[in-house]
Amino acid sequence: MKEFLAYIVKNLVDKPEEVHLKEVQGTNTIIYELTVAKGDIGKIIGKEGRTIKAIRTLLVSVASRDNVKVSLEIMEER
């Protein structure tokens, strides 16, 4: 699933080399922490959050096959 998410995000941004994805596993829960270049955050979120909502919907659909809850968080660069 991590590779699937990375593929989607890298094809949306201008700087795919700056896409970093961290997977944090819990019991029946996976949290993905996504970091992208500052200029690409708007492309990931999309107009009125539509793009990030669609990405999250895809993740939930894929994860439901394995009875796992999944969450995607966009992390701020420091």
UniProtKB/Swiss-Prot annotation:
Q: What does this protein do?
A: A probable RNA-binding protein.
State the GO CC annotations: cytoplasm
Q: Does the keyword RNA-binding apply?
A: yes
What coarse category fits the chief subcellular location reported for this protein? cytoplasm
Q: Does the keyword Cytoplasm apply?
A: yes
Question: InterPro entries given for it?
Answer: KH_dom-like_a/b (IPR015946), KH_sf_prok-type (IPR009019), KhpA (IPR020627)
Per the UniProt entry, the disulfide pairs are: none
Domain KH residues, every copy: 29-78
Task: List, alphabetically, the Pfam families matched.
Answer: KH_KhpA-B
UniProt keyword list: Cytoplasm, RNA-binding
Domain of life, per UniProt, equals Bacteria
Return the protein name. RNA-binding protein KhpA
Q: Where in the cell is it found?
A: Cytoplasm
The family assignment reads: Belongs to the KhpA RNA-binding protein family.
Q: Which GO terms describe its molecular function?
A: RNA binding
